[in-house]
Amino acid sequence: MFNGMVRTIRDSVVGTYPSCHVSSRLEERRAKQRAMRQERRRKPDKPDDFVTYEDSGSDEETPQQQEEVLNTSYNLCDYLRSRESGLRDRRSVNVEYTSRYVLTHDMLRETQISLGYINKVFCSKWLSSRQVVFGTKCNKLLVYDVNMRRVDAIPTLSNSRANHPEVQGGLHAIELSPSRSFLATGARNSSDIAVYRLPTLDPVCVGEGGHRDLIMGMCWLDDQFLVSGSKDSRMALWRINEDHMEFPDGGEEACPTFATIHPLSVKEVRTAQRIRSLCFNKEFKEIAALSLNGYIHIFNAETFKQTLSRKLPNCQDNVSIAYHSDGLYAVGCRSYTILLDARTLQTIKKITSRYSGCGIRATSFEGNLLTVGTGLGMLLFYDIRAGKYLESSVNASRTVALKCSKGIVYPEDEMDGFQQVKYVPAIYTHCYDSTRMRLFAAGGPLPATLVGNYAGVWQ
């Protein structure tokens, strides 16, 4: 059933064979090969114009090849056990096929994460197969270990400006550099950027002087250049190069130190009112920015100059933008998701939500699958090639949707007012791990006045 989806070459333990080491598999393999050869040798009614021939001497497999065949498992459970146990087996996975299979066959189960008194998770990224990092409205940078089920706090970085009023609005963006060498997010002052080294999460630098209001979006252009967008309607270009940074002396205790940097360039985004989200179009070498007044703005990534702005059609409460390599932008707004042609910014399709009052809070592309986080505590999946929501293989009458748990609202007395309307959290962020078989989703109460959180791993 899973042949072609996952492949695990298991190492034999002394004195034992893996469970997949069954001698009859060799005979079954030979029988299939013989049947395929006979089918190819069958003379068609009409002669072929182009014929290929195989070397008959290549039919026999060496003992080493036969041993590898017997040690190879195509079972999904063997793959998952090997991955979660950290075994040295050679593993491969067809991520496009696998992610669709586990979604359409209702195989994902939620593990809710207890965060305590934390207010709203706004951004997240997987660091590895076992660690996911996320930022909150209360300016916490947290790392969750999936295996240990433990949450650790990473210290936020403060700037060098004494007696300078700080902007406190939370961490709204986390981005990893293309080589996964650096992590960029907001600093303790929400109008500054903070960069950490991966995988250790040691501090590298704080970027100050680029913005006057909290940073809402970021995107890496390459391993050195980072762009940030803020509610002050500005975009800033930063260079992250440790060879050009000055690090203070850590003193006798050798405390971790970090540099202070300033932007290479700061641009006021014309016709914009509050930058909400950014993404980088690698194919066209352009930066797309989304503003809360319903415009999409395009910057040339090589010159860092604004080239155009376009008003989005009937777009309210637009908060997220994602780019697909086929030349598509996806913009999430109050009642639907818009697909735009990246060349012309013309609307290709409006994807209406399957549920009424379902505001779009987060969007992302993984392959040809558009994942949408909603204000009703659900994740929806849209196949851009098929032009429809992903359909369940278990129940053909419904589409695939992951319905998240309620999470927590503080104080708990506040929950009483939501019992009649069946309170659910808004999903502000989601991200897949490298195999796309595990999905982190998080958020919190939709009303700004409420304090609470939700976080969970679907696996």
Swiss-Prot record:
GO terms for biological process: autophagic cell death; evoked neurotransmitter secretion; positive regulation of hippo signaling; proteasome-mediated ubiquitin-dependent protein catabolic process; protein polyubiquitination. Pfam families: Beta-prop_DCAF12. WD repeats lie at residues 166-206, 210-248, 270-309. One of its GO terms (molecular function) is ubiquitin-like ligase-substrate adaptor activity. It is found in: Cytoplasm; Nucleus; Presynapse. It comes from the Eukaryota. Gene3D superfamilies: YVTN repeat-like/Quinoprotein amine dehydrogenase. InterPro entries: Beta-prop_DCAF12, DCAF12, WD40/YVTN_repeat-like_dom_sf, WD40_repeat_dom_sf, WD40_rpt. Keywords: Cell projection, Cytoplasm, Nucleus, Repeat, Synapse, Ubl conjugation pathway, WD repeat. SUPFAM superfamilies: WD40 repeat-like. Its main location: cytoplasm. Residues 31-44 have a biased composition (Basic residues). In larvae, expressed in neurons, glia and muscles. Pathway: Protein modification; protein ubiquitination. Disruption phenotype: Embryonic lethality. Residues 25-67 are annotated as: Disordered. GO terms for cellular component: cell projection; Cul4-RING E3 ubiquitin ligase complex; cytoplasm; nucleus; presynapse. Substrate-recognition component of a DCX (DDB1-CUL4-X-box) protein ligase complex. Substrate-recognition component of a DCX (DDB1-CUL4-X-box) E3 ubiquitin-protein ligase complex, which mediates ubiquitination of target proteins, leading to their degradation. Required for synaptic function and plasticity at larval neuromuscular junctions (NMJs) by promoting neurotransmitter release. The DCX(DCAF12) complex catalyzes ubiquitination and degradation of yorkie (yki), thereby regulating the Hippo/SWH (Sav/Wts/Hpo) signaling pathway. Acts as a regulator of tissue growth during development: required for the apoptotic elimination of supernumerary cells during metamorphosis. Belongs to the WD repeat DCAF12 family. This is DDB1- and CUL4-associated factor 12 homolog. It comes from Drosophila melanogaster. The lineage of its organism: Eukaryota, Metazoa, Ecdysozoa, Arthropoda, Hexapoda.
